[in-house]
């Protein structure tokens, strides 16, 4: 039946072709040939090219205006007005030929120029040389790396630790090692730039909550819980992370960790804790914000910190359960594809840990000095102190902005410069303004170390007050 129908249709088509007018057939034939020509012909011919005359060439050359190799830079750009630091950035440092008390460098425990740390680094240099010439998985693992990881794990009372050769890359590599596309990350709006880069690399769904606002975080968690109920199948494969800092780099405030742990278990999320400022600072033994609050470290899924603030070294580490850390050895980009930490810096970090364990009273001394200068800087007309009294790095911001960020920066820089002239070394907090998700207001960052005496702290506070009054009033 189907064959007969097809034959009948074919007969009808042939009959219609015979009955069609001649002009109709000619037009369709021309169109078919034109389509074939368009399909197989080139859009241009190499031979069809007209050469410019000498006069036309000269006119084009005269009209051409080359772009500058380097864009114009204003004379007040920070890159053109730099300070020259001579010697190590220890308790006192020489800036532009003048000895200053250093309130700018992250050297909380004063170990940068510690003789024991220097001796350990020198001995390692003589034994191993300078570098390792490869990543950890490609002949870049030395025994001193394994010793440092073991010491860090024991110090933090975790199962295992992993070290990175660059502090910034530690949390920036750890986050995308676990959080992938489709996962959800709840992160504080004041998170540091390293966390932001890690989130960007993860390509996860990012939800920002107000700084240290647990009510706002719970609101977001509840909203996500409602979304999960609409699609249970998707929810089963979607992981939820909460990323916070122990002490926030951009605000100097401490995270409310006990409340975060409660929300973690209530809404089945994982906590990543960045402790670059709180490690070696908070807690009776310097173990960070978990020890400060008395929280079981197993309640935190991953702890990250750099070794550049308290340990007088370079690099960073992550610690936690063994299965969490082992995953980074194959998935942590900064671990797999960067040359490993130079052995001399690993040896320096081990010796710094020895000093911390032998002298736990150093943390109480640091806390006392932080409180002293924090109190002394209160009540400065035109400036406000931003940060906790126990934080060794806090900010001085303008009480009222001028309405222009550039003008605010200039005012604060004038304060910094005049303090420098009076032998107090300070610095502004610097940001990549176009890259920051939530750009903090301009500020002067003040960093405290255990080596600063009470007299030096009082002198710094009085100098800042006098200079601020002269500049702002």
From Swiss-Prot:
It is found in: Endoplasmic reticulum membrane. Residues 1-15 are lumenal. InterPro entries: Aminotransferase_I/II_large, AON_synthase_class-II, PyrdxlP-dep_Trfase, PyrdxlP-dep_Trfase_major, PyrdxlP-dep_Trfase_small. Residues 37-473 are cytoplasmic. Changing residue 239 to W: In a breast cancer sample; somatic mutation. Changing residue 164 to F: Increased serine palmitoyltransferase activity and sphingolipid content. The modification Phosphotyrosine is found at residue 164. Pathway: Lipid metabolism; sphingolipid metabolism. Pfam families: Aminotran_1_2. Its EC number is 2.3.1.50. It is an enzyme of class 2 (transferase). Its cofactor is pyridoxal 5'-phosphate. SPT complex catalytic activity is negatively regulated by ORMDL proteins, including ORMDL3, in the presence of ceramides. This mechanism allows to maintain ceramide levels at sufficient concentrations for the production of complex sphingolipids, but which prevents the accumulation of ceramides to levels that trigger apoptosis. GO terms for molecular function: pyridoxal phosphate binding; serine C-palmitoyltransferase activity. Keywords: Acyltransferase, Amyotrophic lateral sclerosis, Disease variant, Endoplasmic reticulum, Lipid metabolism, Membrane, Neurodegeneration, Neuropathy, Phosphoprotein, Pyridoxal phosphate, Sphingolipid metabolism, Transferase, Transmembrane, Transmembrane helix. It is a single-pass membrane protein. Induction: Expression at protein level is highly increased in brains of patients with Alzheimer disease. No changes are observed at mRNA level. Residues 1-66 are annotated as: Interaction with SPTLC2. Phosphorylation at Tyr-164 inhibits activity and promotes cell survival. The transmembrane domain is involved in the interaction with ORMDL3. Belongs to the class-II pyridoxal-phosphate-dependent aminotransferase family. Component of the serine palmitoyltransferase (SPT) complex, which is also composed of SPTLC2 or SPTLC3 and SPTSSA or SPTSSB. The heterodimer consisting of SPTLC1 and SPTLC2/SPTLC3 forms the catalytic core of the enzyme, while SPTSSA or SPTSSB subunits determine substrate specificity. SPT also interacts with ORMDL proteins, especially ORMDL3, which negatively regulate SPT activity in the presence of ceramides. Forms dimers of heterodimers with SPTLC2. Interacts with RTN4 (isoform B). This is Serine palmitoyltransferase 1. The gene is SPTLC1.
